[in-house]
Curated annotation (Swiss-Prot):
GO terms for biological process: viral process. This is Protein U33. The gene is U33. InterPro entries: UL49. One of its GO terms (cellular component) is viral tegument. Belongs to the herpesviridae UL49 family. It comes from Human herpesvirus 6A (strain Uganda-1102). It holds the Pfam family Herpes_UL49_1.
Length: 470
């Protein structure tokens, strides 16, 4: 079965016409940079089984490679699958095995959610003893049930199609770093005596049976996480131009300290796990009049640990990585809640992850700062997306929904925009765009610039009047 990996590299690898780390991105984000350039995109489908059009396209390319292959390759194929003639069923099986092979390569670096870590050698060993009559049935008529039965035999779990990204915290799959929670060796200082020398061996012997794990490492993780949450700036000692925690490029120098690995993962999580995105302001003519502002306007409650917006209401924001937030937890009153309020401790919790680290963030805010003795006013616009993984919307082909402030200068309500791409989102706050709520479409409210006898013009109207549009 050593020839199986060689066969997959010769026949399937030429169908992957892309750059480095594309397979890693495919398993982490569930999206391909350039559609149609990787054979694994066959498994990116919302249907029950593979997409027929994509499968037919790659099968035609694969068949051209098969016609040019050497006789030794065809002999290996006959020996492994007892098939001399190439069929579409055999191509689907080879594509699935290549999918499993690439999954095993990715799992050597990362521990991905709901994907069981298994070595490729073990996969080959299990595939060798797969019943021949089931394999022949799969080759004659490939279907999801047949492929799923083979997947259950190899991994002892269901096959998830498309490539599984249905998780509560999508981008945290990247930060489930491989084996960083393993128990460290206990360092002890002791005298060279016989009864003392047996003490470390006794600790190691009974530590394997203890369900508590490494309590010192757990406390250190809590300290690091709380510090990264409370501090605005901090330094993590990582070697120059070396991503050892994620890609161990220098194994001869030993393992990277696991607590630093966790610190790096926490730092990246705080920067990427969010459902609020800052928008570039290309035009200040939409700066809102301060006469209509309310204290509770445009405040969204964000869980600092999982990054979800917890007060989006009944709005269902569609996104490729999203899931229904309002249907996660039900209480005795059968009402949908995203926040849990404890009457005993007088503390609020996130109903999705149970964290107490809740922050309040405004999606529209006008602030004033003092820089080198000069007063500088800034206007910030933000959008709320339906997933907590901000990196998933960076693909131009992905469409998603957002909640943004109303573009009317006298309104402090929100608008739900459908099927937005990242390019449209970046050009949203510009002179030519208009996104008003239903209330503004049927009513007119005067701002400071509309009043003839207005003496004191608010800051928002001053900015809208004096700043030149781009």
């Amino acid at each position: 079965m050593f020839y199986l990996k060689k066969l997959l590299r010769q026949l399937l690898a030429p169908l992957c016409k892309h750059g480095s780390y594309t397979h890693l991105q495919l398993f982490v984000m569930g999206e391909a940079c350039v559609p149609g350039k990787c054979v694994l995109t066959m498994f990116l489908t919302n249907k029950k089984f593979l997409n027929k059009e994509v499968t037919e396209k790659f099968y035609n390319e694969f068949f051209a490679i098969w016609l040019r292959c050497r006789p030794e390759t065809r002999l290996i194929t006959k020996r492994l699958f007892n098939k001399m003639v190439m069929t579409k069923g055999l191509f689907v099986l080879l594509a699935y095995l290549y999918f499993v092979y690439r999954q095993c390569k990715v799992l050597e670096l990362l521990s991905l959610y709901k994907l069981k870590t298994i070595k490729w050698v073990d996969v080959e060993t299990r595939f060798r003893v797969y019943p021949p009559y089931k394999l022949n049935k799969l080759l004659e008529m490939p279907s999801f049930s047949e492929i799923n039965e083979l997947h259950m035999f190899l991994f002892e779990q269901q096959l998830l199609l498309p490539i599984p990204t249905h998780v509560n915290l999508p981008c945290m799959r990247l930060f489930c770093l491989r084996d960083y929670e393993q128990t460290e060796t206990v360092m002890l200082r002791y005298r060279q005596r016989e009864h003392v020398l047996s003490f470390p061996s006794m600790l190691r012997k009974y530590a394997l049976k203890s369900p508590a794990g490494n309590f010192m490492f757990t406390m250190a993780k809590a300290l690091v996480e709380n510090f990264c949450f409370s501090a605005d700036r901090y330094l993590i000692p990582v070697e120059h131009n070396n991503l050892v925690p994620m890609v161990p490029s220098k194994p001869e120098r030993g393992d990277f300290p696991k607590i630093l690995t966790f610190a790096l993962a926490t730092s990246l999580k705080d920067g990427l796990a969010t459902s609020v995105i800052s928008l570039p302001v290309m035009c200040y003519c939409k700066t809102k009049c301060s006469r209509f502002i309310l204290e509770e306007s445009y405040i969204c409650v964000i869980c600092a640990k999982c990054g979800h917006c917890l007060n989006s209401g009944k709005e269902k924001l569609c996104s490729p990585q999203g899931f229904s937030l309002s249907s996660m937890f039900y209480f005795r009153d059968k009402q949908e809640k995203n926040l849990i309020y404890s009457m005993h401790t007088d503390v609020m919790y996130c109903s999705l992850c149970g964290s107490q680290q809740l922050v309040f963030e405004r999606i529209y805010e006008m602030s004033e700062h003092c820089v080198l003795g000069m007063k500088v006013k800034t206007v910030s616009w933000k959008a709320v997306i339906g997933t907590n993984s901000a990196c998933t919307i960076l693909n131009d082909n992905v469409k998603f929904d957002v909640i943004v402030p109303c573009s009317c200068r006298s309104c402090y309500s929100t608008v739900h925009l459908y099927n937005v791409t990242v390019k449209k989102l970046l050009r949203l706050v510009s002179h030519g765009s208009d996104f008003q709520c239903q209330r503004c479409q049927h009513s007119f409210r005067e701002t400071c610039l509309d009043l003839e006898d207005c003496v004191n013009i608010c800051q928002g109207c001053q900015i809208s009047q004096n700043v030149r549009c781009i």
